[in-house]
Regions:
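N-terminal interaction modules that seed assembly of large macromolecular complexes
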Residues: 20-68
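Short, charged, low-complexity loops and linkers
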Residues: 13-24, 90-94
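Long, charge-rich C-terminal accessory regions
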Residues: 120-187, 192
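Acidic, low-complexity proline/glycine-rich segments
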Residues: 1-12
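Internal, hydrophobic cores of structured domains that mediate oligomerization or house catalytic pockets
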Residues: 48-150
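A cross-kingdom marker for long, charged
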Residues: 174-261
Length: 261
């Protein structure tokens, strides 16, 4: 898949979600989350919420193609960025819970791809003019992530355990990972935008290694989190197509956030 515009990104993600649903492939979990983020960004572009809608279409297309390239490389010969290999490599591991699959995708896409896409959209000094729209895209991402995580609760009855043993100050674990990462992503975007090709390659490699290390911590956490994950996994739905369909419709359920603290 190579997207030319944001509509192509939405269509490409919808295709992956459809295919994953048919095949019972957990790659559809993050793809469903990401499809909804992209639909919300497109709605914001059409609604004139960004300073420069055409620029954000370009940004989102570059961002989406980073995911499609990683997905295609993994499917082809298990290659691609390290952090995406970590995420895709856990798709067949029965012990990984739904929310881990989501966080692994969010980790790779924010900690590696977001900064690269931003720097390519607005290279050099132009990067500073992107900041407001960059933060707005992150707000949209955070909102969709929270809604999807709330919807995971219906499939994963003991998910709230993670907040108690793993996340600081009772913050939802996915929300924390998004907000923690976005300021770093902006810093790295500014860094990349001002670098030459050789410097940029070295920075991208460093970001990939760091995101891959984070992915390993997400996949195999220590301490109290591990037994909590085993308990959560034992009560989660095993019906992968049903989970994908549920996640893919999270934004269409207005009541999903009610009753969540």
């Amino acid at each position: 898949v190579t997207a030319e515009n944001i509509d192509d990104v939405v269509d490409g993600l919808a295709g992956i979600v459809r295919e994953a649903g048919r095949a019972g492939d957990r790659v559809g979990y993050f793809a469903a989350l990401y499809r909804q983020v992209t639909v919300e960004v497109r709605t914001a572009i059409h609604g004139g919420l960004f300073d420069d809608g055409a620029r954000m279409d370009r940004f989102d297309t570059l961002f989406g193609n980073r995911y499609f390239d990683a997905y295609d490389a993994w499917r082809r010969d298990r290659s691609g960025p390290r952090c995406w290999r970590e995420a895709f490599g856990l798709l067949d591991e029965a012990d990984t819970i739904i929310v881990q699959h989501l966080i692994l995708g969010v980790n790779a896409h924010i900690n590696l791809d977001l900064a690269i896409a931003a720097a390519r959209t607005s290279p050099g000094e132009a990067i500073h003019g992107l900041r407001r729209d960059f933060l707005l895209i992150n707000d949209i991402l955070g909102r969709v992530v929270l809604t999807v995580q709330d919807s995971v609760g219906a499939l994963s009855p003991f998910l709230s355990l993670l907040d108690r043993v793993g996340a600081r100050n009772d913050e939802r674990i996915l929300d924390f990972s998004v907000r923690q990462s976005r300021e770093e992503a902006w810093y790295n975007a500014v860094l990349l935008a001002g670098q030459n090709e050789k410097e940029r390659e070295a920075t991208i490699q460093r970001l990939d290694i760091r995101a891959a290390v984070l992915a390993r911590l997400i996949a195999r956490p220590a301490g109290l989190v591990r037994p909590a994950l085993q308990l959560i996994r034992s009560t989660e739905s095993d019906d992968v197509p049903a989970v994908i369909a549920h996640l893919d419709n999270a934004m269409e359920r207005p009541s999903v956030r009610q009753g969540t603290g």
